[in-house]
Amino acid sequence: FKALGPQFVERTRTEPGCMHYAFSFNGTTAHCREGYANAEAVLAHLQNVGELLGQALQIAKIVRLEVHAPASEIEKLRAPMASLSPQFFALEPGIRRASEA
């Protein structure tokens, strides 16, 4: 699976709605942390990496898929993402910094 990581990153690099995207590893467990501008960007990403995701799911399983977004964006994702069985979390206002103050 780890060998597919750079391919995922390259495919994702030019997506205009992608805010951040990276993999981290702990032994044989991979974590992909990604953020998108809106639901449409999430769906565009899934379409863009669909072939790679199919390859990845042949050799690995999704242990947990969390989607954190405003409730209005979650509603746009429920049906299209149903086959991935995500957990949805309604995001409340908070703080987000681009860099340290």
Residue map of PLM features:
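Vicinal oxygen chelate
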Residues: 83-101
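An amphipathic, aromatic/His-enriched active-site/gating alpha helix that lines ligand/cofactor pockets
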Residues: 13-19, 35-88
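A contiguous binding-surface segment within folded domains or other stable secondary-structure elements
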Residues: 1-31
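Short linear sequence elements within intrinsically disordered, low-complexity coil regions
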Residues: 6, 26, 41, 93-94
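Short, flexible active-site-adjacent loop segments at beta-strand->alpha-helix junctions, enriched
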Residues: 27, 71-73, 95
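Repeat-unit-sized solenoid/scaffold elements
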Residues: 21, 63-65, 97-101
